[in-house]
Amino acid sequence: IHKSKTLRQFLVRPKLLFLLVFFLTISCQPSKNMYMSGETNEFPSIEGNNLNKEKKVVPDDFVDKDLIIIVAFQQWHQGLVDQSINLLESNEMDLTHNIIEVPTIRKTNKLNEIYLDGVMRAGIRDDRIRNRTITAYLNKEEFKEDLDIPNEETIYWFLIEEGTSKILIQGEGIITEKELELIQSY
């Protein structure tokens, strides 16, 4: 019994050491800028995948209608995103506008991205929601600077003019009834 316990400990320690070294290695990969900076009042082109594993470029792939982009930075922002989208959809804005949510995550490495995408995909079964959720792995500081986003404490939303990357209006936090009226006026 003593020998088998020692053997188990001997076999488990190298596995733990390997996992520790592996995760330290992947977490230290250099960050790459995965978007192009836009001009003033322009939303930068950012690449990502929706939760159906389709590559998308925001806003370039959504030019047939005005586009509402809701940008989130923290996992707990999902409730704020959902409230905003519920307000938009209950007022049939999804018929006249493309509405997407863009969770932004600091660029790490492909293995981490695959894992995080899988976790998000597993939690969302609705194909419509999977299609409109485009995860962007990018340099968050540069992204925030380009869009004059001061911090990651809340969500930020942008109304983009049809066929362009021009920001018509933008706001922060849950979209309110008053902001909805402003969006509808464009």
Locations of the language-model features?
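Structural microenvironment flanking redox-active thiols in thiol-disulfide oxidoreductases
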Residues: 77-126
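C-terminal motif of bacterial Sec signal peptides marking the signal peptidase cleavage site
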Residues: 26-27
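Short, internal strand/loop/helix patches
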Residues: 100-102, 116-152
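Thiol-/selenol-based redox modules, centered on thioredoxin-like
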Residues: 145, 153-186
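N-terminal "domain-start" segment that seeds a small globular fold
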Residues: 31-59, 78-79
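Bacterial N-terminal signal peptides that target proteins for export
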Residues: 3-17
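Short active-site neighborhood of thiol/selenol oxidoreductases, capturing the structured segment around
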Residues: 61-81
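Soluble, non-transmembrane catalytic domains of enzymes that act on hydrophobic metabolites at membranes
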Residues: 57-61, 72, 172-177
